[in-house]
Amino acid sequence: SIEFLHGMKLVWETIMKHLVDHYKGLAILRSVSVSHFDGNPWDKGGTCKKTQPYFDPDGKMELPWTPNEIFKIQNNELRKAIVLKGNASKPILKLLDVTYSSLLRPDGHPGVYRIQSSTEPKNDCVHWCMPGPIDMWNQLMFSDPDVMCMNMSKDSNS
């Protein structure tokens, strides 16, 4: 809904302003990941029983409307923050873009693998726990030289 997106924009504006004004390190912000409910939303009996990744060699699979709009907000607010910080070397602001790659991994949700009590939700198609998606996010993050340099300097100070 429009109210949700407006709230998301305000949150990202506030976070970016705070980082630019008060933070002097490396900030890695993760883009929105995609849920994979089939049939209905989570609270109306939607399920996510996928056990294999999607195959999209041409990159033509479209993002659902809501994650696409959230991603635009995240990207725009990060760009505005980079302009706002100007020539300052700190903070270093990075966006770990997992939005499209998470779309391709409906098999990474715990829903079909969970053992749950009768009081717990029956499907979890939003959170990530299975090997694959999270490992790929880590590889993306640590392939960035700024992240590697920050980690190396932390290790050398201990």
Where are these regions (language model features)?
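Extracellular glycan-modifying ectodomains
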Residues: 1-158
